[in-house]
Design a protein with these regions (language model features):
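Transmembrane helical cores of multi-pass ion-transport proteins
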Residues: 1-419, 482
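Structured cytosolic domains appended to multi-pass membrane proteins
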Residues: 420-545
Length: 545
């Protein structure tokens, strides 16, 4: 409850701030209504379940999250993975996956993994986000044009099926869809209409047209899903199955990762707009609790929503009160106007999702960044992008993270320098029968081949080899085992090994692993100058004798 507590300490829950937060919460609630319904339908569930998700999740995240201006609810980022779960396991499976994802998010927050999410490479995030946008866009063609549901299990099969059926589009449905899309695009460009929540107005206009003219054959919320019940979310237990739960662990992990990424990105955007500072770990705790509790009230996966959070800030929201009011607004609309939703054309909701898909994909930004990005980043983007489209999001995220990690390890290994020092002032301070090797960078598994190859090139028989670790910031278990092996090999050849310059962390690792004992007394020396002086003294004594 960091956000709520900080807002209280800052006086933002006082009466002086009530008006701003109440107004912001009402406006965000109006904006969230069509989005929540659209995301639910795209996920393959009933529209009211999207509203339930927004109501329950937003209250929990407002109270227990780490950002005092965050607005939570269903988002477009989840559509690709959640629709697949719904198609395969049904709504009960979707609820179980949400619950599992919530538990994972909760533990991520409790074990302070919030800071680690930012280590996921940006090309991976951009790639799967753009891919999700394309999947959403194509997935709404049937509703937008009045086409039969696309056949085929995979994206390319569905795309081919939709392209073949385009000549059979339903004229009235397509006209309503195009009208809705045009209104969405034009409203922000008209000064008088710019501040109005365009998705809500599009929904109202399209619904009024359908109510007045009753276009034959136009699919509506009522014809597809029946009447939306005029009831608030109530407690109910999802149907649990042990076998199904095991199958849902991997998809749930993907949901958790997506939720963590989007909620923390939203919190960062909010900090930039509002001048606040969020707690990443507490935000994950709040998101985890929201996803654990929401399935028990008829909802599904939720996360911080960037667009709704930004709207909250622009309208003057500065405390968690706005998030609570947003939930109350949705609840009141549900109680007062649920029957009116029956005439909402699905084509209008599809138009809203077209805009969501475009905003998620950010084509202009992607092109601009990819033009300047290194080749490896471009390749990583397209790997994740095409896997998201052609395989699925689970595969895309996992392979994207693995490939980016391997690339990073390769780059780090290249950056590690292992060299024989012969012509520097420090090398000149050593006796002639002493060789010095310098390691610069993390002493980890990726650099061990370079280390062993460099030291294997010792084709003389020096009396002593000095390993200078002054610039080694970290040593892992592979580095320790390799160092142990190399030291043992040199000692078998009668070559003394001295290690110098290790920092406290590296020294502690060497001591725990027994490397310092293996070196022998007096062969681990903190300062290089002390080692050089000792070797010169020993050489002088040997020469004198």
């Amino acid at each position: 409850m960091i956000a709520w507590t900080e807002a209280s300490r800052a006086g933002l829950l006082g009466r002086a701030h009530w008006a701003n937060n109440i107004v912001a919460g009402i406006i965000v609630g109006v904006v969230a209504l069509p989005l929540s319904m659209a995301f639910a339908i795209a996920t393959g569930v009933k529209p009211e379940q999207g509203i339930y998700t927004a109501i329950v999740a937003s209250v929990i995240v407002a109270v227990a999250g780490g950002s005092r201006v965050q607005i939570a609810g269903p988002t477009g980022a989840f559509i690709a993975i959640l629709s697949g779960i719904t198609a395969k396991f049904g709504f009960d499976g979707l609820q179980i996956a949400t619950l599992l994802a919530g538990i994972m998010l909760l533990f991520m927050g409790l074990f302070r993994f919030g800071g680690m999410i930012r280590f996921i490479a940006m090309p991976v995030i951009m790639g799967f986000t753009a891919g999700i946008g394309v999947v959403i866009f194509v997935g709404q063609w049937a509703a937008f044009f009045g086409l039969p549901k696309a056949g085929g299990e995979h994206f390319h099969q569905q795309l081919w099926s939709l392209l073949h059926s385009l000549p059979n589009l339903h004229p009235a449905t397509a006209a309503l869809g195009l009208f809705s899309l045009a209104l969405l695009l034009l409203m922000p460009k008209v000064p008088l209409l710019r501040r109005l929540p365009s998705p809500m107005w599009v929904l109202l206009c399209a619904t009024v047209l359908q109510s007045l003219f009753r276009f034959e054959g136009v699919a509506t919320v009522g014809s597809a899903y029946g009447a939306i019940p005029r009831t608030l979310p109530h407690f109910s237990l999802p149907a649990f199955s042990a076998a199904q739960t095991v199958q849902l662990i991997l998809p749930a992990f993907t949901v958790a990762m997506l939720g963590a990424i989007e909620s923390l990105l939203s919190a960062v955007v909010a900090d930039g707009m509002a001048g606040t500072r969020h707690s990443a770990n507490q935000e994950l705790v709040g998101q985890g609790l929201a996803n654990i509790i929401t399935p028990f009230f008829g909802g599904f996966a939720a996360t911080g929503a960037i667009a709704r959070t930004a709207t909250n800030i622009r309208q003057g929201g500065n405390s968690p009160l706005a998030g609570v009011v947003h939930a109350l607004t949705l609840a009141l609309i549900l109680l007062a106007a649920a029957p009116l939703a029956a005439d909402i054309p699905l084509a209008a909701l599809a138009a809203i999702l077209f805009q969501v898909a475009w905003n998620m994909s950010e084509p202009k930004r992607c092109i601009r960044i990819l033009r300047r990005a290194p080749r490896a980043a471009v390749v990583l983007f397209f790997i994740t992008f095409f896997l998201t489209i052609l395989a699925d999001l689970v595969v895309a995220v996992n392979i994207g993270v693995i490939v980016s990690t391997l690339h990073f390890i390769g780059q780090m290994a290249k950056a590690v320098e292992v060299r024989k020092e012969e012509h520097s002032r420090d090398a000149a301070a050593l006796p002639d029968n002493v060789l010095m090797f310098i390691v610069n960078g993390p002493f980890f598994f990726g650099a061990m081949e370079k280390f062993e190859t460099t030291l294997a090139d010792i084709n003389t028989q020096p009396r002593t080899v000095v390993l200078r670790l002054r610039w080694v910031s970290y040593i892992d278990i592979t580095g320790i085992l390799t160092l142990e092996r190399v030291i043992g090999s040199l000692q078998k050849r009668g070559i003394r090994v001295i290690v110098t310059g290790a920092n406290e962390q590296v020294r502690a690792s060497l001591e725990r692993s027994g490397i310092i004992t293996l070196l022998g007394e007096g062969n681990f020396i903190r300062e290089f100058d002390d080692a050089a002086a000792m070797l010169r003294a020993e050489d002088k004594a040997a020469t004198a004798s």
